[in-house]
């Protein structure tokens, strides 16, 4: 694909999200979502392999169904109220249709089945766009929607997503599928929190974007597609392995890393509002996900598979790895800053 075409498509994806965030008319919101989706499709099948095309078609079908459901809910709401304004509280049936459409967009349970297969069939960079940027517009819609209509369907779907995200990643060996289930779980955390504290949910979204961007870029630079690649530590420097493990554990919410703020802020907000049961379910789901993240770290650092003695220092003498290591150091700086600096900002957001 020509570079100018790629830039144009990326700008169109960004423009679609900006239109959704700034619009107050349901038709314009639908138009922004469609613009972003249609511009992303050529970017997704950039590699043009059978697995890549299959994942792209799955993503297109899911997003087309979601957009049709959203437009249908907007039409029914316009029929009830006589207006296309998104500022008017919705009736019960269009509210349910919109909740299902947003659940498909965000990959919430039980509308999540497409996400692991799609991310597994795409390269890391394209998967990063779906797991981060494409979640911003539906989440902003959900944030605004929760202020007008409290949807128990969305809350239930988010709680189930936290459990599915933890349970589904236990038997996975593909890193992209692990990241997909992690995305499902983290979306559940953000959605539940948005119903009770919009400011905390916005902060959690920012932290999620930072951590997810870091881990996708690191795994892409190091070409780590399976857990077996992580076990082959002789081909990577200790700095790279440490960075991968810290970022993965941060994604799981291990204190005192960045991801812990995401979980701590949410639980603090829910417990203050008296939702102890919701908090208990979320903690159980978080422990499940943290278990397989800790298992990855254990297998990578404490288990050394049989290999030749010369290969143990191969990374030190390799000249071909220098450009790769330069990219890794660039991402490392970004990741380490996020790991060390963000926990210091807790008092700015929470009055203990």
UniProtKB/Swiss-Prot annotation:
GO terms for biological process: mitochondrial electron transport, NADH to ubiquinone. It catalyses: a ubiquinone + NADH + 5 H(+)(in) = a ubiquinol + NAD(+) + 4 H(+)(out). It holds the Pfam family NADH_dehy_S2_C. The chain crosses the membrane at residues 4-24, 26-46, 60-80, 96-116, 124-144, 150-170, 178-198, 205-225, 241-261, 274-294, 330-350. It is an enzyme of class 7 (translocase). Its EC number is 7.1.1.2. GO terms for molecular function: NADH dehydrogenase (ubiquinone) activity. It is a multi-pass membrane protein. GO terms for cellular component: mitochondrial inner membrane. InterPro entries: Complex_I_Subunit_2 (IPR050175), NADH_DH_su2_C (IPR010933), NADH_UbQ_OxRdtase_chain2 (IPR003917), ND/Mrp_TM (IPR001750). The keyword Signal does not apply. Its main location: mitochondrion. The keyword Protein biosynthesis does not apply. It is found in: Mitochondrion inner membrane. This is NADH-ubiquinone oxidoreductase chain 2. The lineage of its organism: Eukaryota, Metazoa, Echinodermata, Eleutherozoa, Echinozoa. The gene is ND2.
